[in-house]
Amino acid sequence: MNVDIDTLVYLVPIAGIIGLIVAGVLTKWVMRKDTGTPEMKVIGDAIREGAMAYKTIAIISVIVAVLLVALDWRISIAFLIGAFFSSLSGYIGMRVSVSSNIRTASAARRSLNESLLTSFRGGAVSGLAVVVLSLLGVTGIFFLYLFMLNNDSDFESQSAWFSSTLNLVAGYAFGASFAALFAQLGGGIYTKAADVGADLVGKVEAGIPEDDPRN
């Protein structure tokens, strides 16, 4: 069966929108779960406060984007778009994850199946957010420069436009990877700090040795 390439191009943003809807439905389902005891809520709020720090990534991304203007202002904009969508997907995933972890712990008190379902759907939101926002970002750049091709005399041929679009996609990917790199480094440090803190609490307050399997 032959499929028109133009039809496939327009199916990409439609698939992205459907993915956002599914992620929204899963998020709503997870948020309906109870957050457990008051002590669990206190711990969950502390985790949420520390995990939502994205200010440093935004500042560094803007600095790099300014430097990229020397190459091409369009690549700089693509870099910012990539960094924005990467940070947005991380923000959505982190927000749902830190909200679902305490709900997963609360669900485990009632049923292991409910706990597994809560954690699975909470994690699915992160995966969907990454894929969907990547699709929408690349598609947005494609349609933007498709419009410029029809209204800008700088592109003398289809091949010139295609080459420029590839550079923009590279700039978009660089921005997305740049933001994701700092998010991963920050997340690793935060996770290790939480691990060490848990070991200290178990050792000092509960009297459990550091190498004990219970700690």
Regions found by a protein language model. Name each.
Residues 2-215:
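Hydrophobic, small-residue-rich transmembrane alpha-helices and their short perimembrane loops
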